């Protein structure tokens, strides 16, 4: 698991974001094209300490494509000449800009890794029993130079040989991006390179964070956001519960609030406030619909990848997906109600929130979406050291229930606590799944009628939001930090009255 590790791929990605943020803050349309052209040479040259590829020319070619994606633009076609800055006029704005699809494989960066297969390693002892030969149904294994050898032409990739080897000498080869994708959206193009089937993709970003060559990336809105901030627009941040620890182990909410103010934000709200509203609403929804038998079960909807996957692959359960506002939207509408002249920026761990914010029903509520990773790059572009800033007050005070939404199981737990408190006579049955592969399994069970009466939480990322594609730290550290933040909350659950807030 590479998430949270400071790898070369990660440093490359963040450096591109930092340079693009600088372009946005500079906000000079007259020099934009030249500035974009200069970035690959600035990042990759003879003095570059980090060697991104075996050739500076290939490295620069990859940086150029990353640069386009970070500007919100699509990759250039491989079979015809298109200038690096083609289309930049459309993205050179201070409003949300998005060209589908969100996730793209950079062909020049993909190493065309082998797909699933098995290979004998040097751990093989050439044992007398050779159980690998005995169990192979196709006779694909023979002894060569005293070691087992797999004939790839005969091998059917069943894995039986690996399962019986007493030395664990047979390695399973899998494409990392393919292995990470829970909806089988990664296929191969005619050159054997990874390609994303957008009909299946739900934009969770797990392929992106698991590719060791950094060949997959999503599109960003940091350029447009930086432009808006540089123009002095009234912009308010809403920050997701998983923020704890993401900007440094000793960085507090007051540090973050002050640093965002230095960047140009007018105010900062916790998305956990919207989660509090959602927990009460979902509790009522469960009691009103599932307990009465009107619905067989209730699926949470705060994770967009989970909700989109359910709609794409399990259309029969669409009616069971909660229609309550997600925490991001509930918080954004609260902000717009109090500050109708402001733009709202969601800062979170999630790549697929960018798609949620582009929906027709949401786009007027959330003006920009950036990840923790992208926000850190924006701080870096401005030379902001968060530890040097501290606000007089923290965020608006949310409850532990709402803050717990950031961890797998936390959504269902918050709703369950609200039901136990406000509907004490109701027995609630809870199930949850994390990671899209597990989510598919639980939806299969639900569709088969085996989870009737349940409140079912799904999280697209293994670990929940704290393990999202746009996070900065290892999952274990994030989980520990969030648990402490939840524990230190002044209130455990929200008052029932929050359900009466009009946000529709």
Where are these regions (language model features)?
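Acidic, serine/threonine-rich, charge-biased low-complexity segments
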Residues: 77-83, 96-99
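Iron-sulfur cluster-binding cysteine motifs and their immediate structural context
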Residues: 129-152, 160-197, 202, 206-221, ...
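Active-site-facing alpha/beta catalytic cores
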Residues: 123, 154-157, 203, 286-287
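Iron-sulfur-associated redox domains of electron-transfer enzymes in respiratory
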Residues: 1-78, 218-504
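Short flexible coil/turn linkers enriched for glycine and charged/polar residues
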Residues: 114-117, 130, 159, 205, ...
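Glycine-rich adenosyl-nucleotide cofactor-binding module
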Residues: 113-134, 163
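N-terminal [4Fe-4S]-dependent radical SAM core
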Residues: 92-121, 138-139
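Short glycine-rich or small-residue beta-strand-to-loop segments that form or flank ligand, phosphate
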Residues: 119-121, 151, 237-239
């Amino acid at each position: 698991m590479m998430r949270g590790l400071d790898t070369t791929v990660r440093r490359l990605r963040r450096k591109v974001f930092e340079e693009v943020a600088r372009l946005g803050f500079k906000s000079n349309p007259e020099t934009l094209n030249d500035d974009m052209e200069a970035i690959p040479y600035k990042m990759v040259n003879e003095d570059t300490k980090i060697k991104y590829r075996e050739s500076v020319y290939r490295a620069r070619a990859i940086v150029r494509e990353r640069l386009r994606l970070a500007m919100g633009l699509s990759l250039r076609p491989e079979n015809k000449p298109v200038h690096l800055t083609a289309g930049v006029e459309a993205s050179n704005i201070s409003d949300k800009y998005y060209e589908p699809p969100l996730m793209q494989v950079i062909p020049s960066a993909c190493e065309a890794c082998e797909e699933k297969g098995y290979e004998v390693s040097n751990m093989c002892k050439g044992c007398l029993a050779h159980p690998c030969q005995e169990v192979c149904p196709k006779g694909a294994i023979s002894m060569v130079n005293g070691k087992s050898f797999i004939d790839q032409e005969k091998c059917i990739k069943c894995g039986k040989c690996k399962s019986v080897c007493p030395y664990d000498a047979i390695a399973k080869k899998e494409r990392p991006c393919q292995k990470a994708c829970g909806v089988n959206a990664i296929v191969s193009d005619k050159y054997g390179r990874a390609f994303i089937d957008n009909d299946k993709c739900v934009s969770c970003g797990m392929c992106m964070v698991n590719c060791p060559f950094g060949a997959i990336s999503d599109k960003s809105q940091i350029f447009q956001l930086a432009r808006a901030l540089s123009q002095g627009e009234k912009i308010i941040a809403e920050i997701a519960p998983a923020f704890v620890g993401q900007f440094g182990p000793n960085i507090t909410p007051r540090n973050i609030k002050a640093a965002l103010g230095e960047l140009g934000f007018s105010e900062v709200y916790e998305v956990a406030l919207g989660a509090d509203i959602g927990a009460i609403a979902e509790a009522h929804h469960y009691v009103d619909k599932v307990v009465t038998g009107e619905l067989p079960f209730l699926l949470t909807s705060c994770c967009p990848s989970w909700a989109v996957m359910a709609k794409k692959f399990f259309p029969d359960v669409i009616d069971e997906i909660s229609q309550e506002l997600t925490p991001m939207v509930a918080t954004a509408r609260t902000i717009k109600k109090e500050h109708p002249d402001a733009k709202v920026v969601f800062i979170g761990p999630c790549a697929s929130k960018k798609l949620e914010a582009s929906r027709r029903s949401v786009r007027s509520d959330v003006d920009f979406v950036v990840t923790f990773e992208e926000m850190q790059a924006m701080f870096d572009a401005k030379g902001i050291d968060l530890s040097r800033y501290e606000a007089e007050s923290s965020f608006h005070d949310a409850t532990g229930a709402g803050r717990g939404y950031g961890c797998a199981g936390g959504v269902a737990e918050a709703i369950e606590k609200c039901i136990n408190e406000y509907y004490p006579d109701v027995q609630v049955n809870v199930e949850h799944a994390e990671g899209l592969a597990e989510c598919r399994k639980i939806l299969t069970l639900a569709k088969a009628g085996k989870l009737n009466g349940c409140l079912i939480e799904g999280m697209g990322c293994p670990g929940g939001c704290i393990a999202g594609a746009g996070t900065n730290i290892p999952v274990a550290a994030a989980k520990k930090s969030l648990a402490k933040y939840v524990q230190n909350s002044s209130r455990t659950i929200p008052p029932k009255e929050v359900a009466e807030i009009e946000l529709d």
